[in-house]
């Protein structure tokens, strides 16, 4: 999830191709290129799809190191703008991120793209990729309390990632039902 690895575009493509082929051949309507820490990897996957499966719709979601930077150090605006040339990408966003990063990142993305915006952050628990452990800090707002802010900031596809559960997903569903 840190993006601190280097492969060639061809190596990224060889790694992802078997799963992509299985999913596309099974008839998926949209392919999730999710939890991506590295722009070069995303672009390699998109080039592969453009050549082999040009009709396949996808969405891309990045992991973040802060509200303006994806995990490999690429500025978020650059990572979002890089997707604009790919007509197959119908939505962009972030996932597996801390709650406090979501709203500022959404506002940033909304200024760059007209594509649908996706967020599915972790609950308030925080993951440390070095120790591979979760901790529960005291936060100023809960997942449930922040959903309206994310919607207001432009998110139209909202879900949950690590340590979210039925309570958080119900809160998203209830909010969407009230605000259609």
Please tell me what each predicted stretch does:
Residues 1-180:
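Domain-level signal for soluble alpha/beta catalytic cores
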